[in-house]
Amino acid sequence: MITKKNLNKIKAKATKFKFKKYDREAASLYARKYAKNPNKDYPFYGKPDYKGDCTNFTSQCLYAGGIVTDNVGKYQWYKLNSAWRGANKFYEYWNNNKGSGSTKGLKASKSIFKDIRLADLIEKKPENAVTHTVIVTGYKVDSWGFNDPWKYKYDVLICQHSDDKKSGMLKDYPLSAKKWSTKETIYVKISGSYK
């Protein structure tokens, strides 16, 4: 019997998707513009009704950077679904949805600090679940090196939303000030998406 779910799987397998590069500059500009004052075109998932707005905000940044929404297959990411607005659901999405010519959606991978660049994401996973997501908007360096300050950075600057509009909205904030341990930090390299 053909169901809507089966039809989505068939369509996903039969379709060849084209790669679209991530516009890091556009994503970063969006993050910096809306870090302190949320975009009124989207709901704010803060106190007292929700646990936080971090992943809703980083999803908006990805979308502003040209990442296409994905409503095909088991793992999906589109405006205001659970993966769009929830840190752990977003982790499950990008970690399981391996964007490729036959899989629609985000192409992202785990990375290491030295390879993180503008508009990549960083997630906090203290135990069994991701609890927070931020976007990289800058760097701190001791030396400029070989025309690649990202390579010689000792810290990155981040933008974030949280559950509290007064204290949780950060713009160009040093990641080191958050004091996350190495074990609980996941660096997410964003390559682009397949559409």
Predicted segments with their positions:
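Short loop/turn segments at secondary-structure transitions that flank enzyme active sites
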Residues: 64, 68, 140, 164
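Short, solvent-exposed loop/turn and secondary-structure capping segments
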Residues: 70-74, 136-137, 171-172
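Intrinsically disordered, low-complexity coil segments
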Residues: 40, 46-51, 140-154, 172-181
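N-terminal capping segments
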Residues: 3-83
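Low-complexity, intrinsically disordered terminal/linker segments enriched in charged
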Residues: 1-3, 176-177
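...with weaker cross-activation on analogous glycine-rich loops/strands in unrelated enzymes
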Residues: 78-158
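Low-complexity, Gly/Ser/Thr/Pro-rich intrinsically disordered linker/tail segments
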Residues: 152-165, 170-195
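Active-site scaffold segments
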Residues: 55-64, 133-137, 157-160
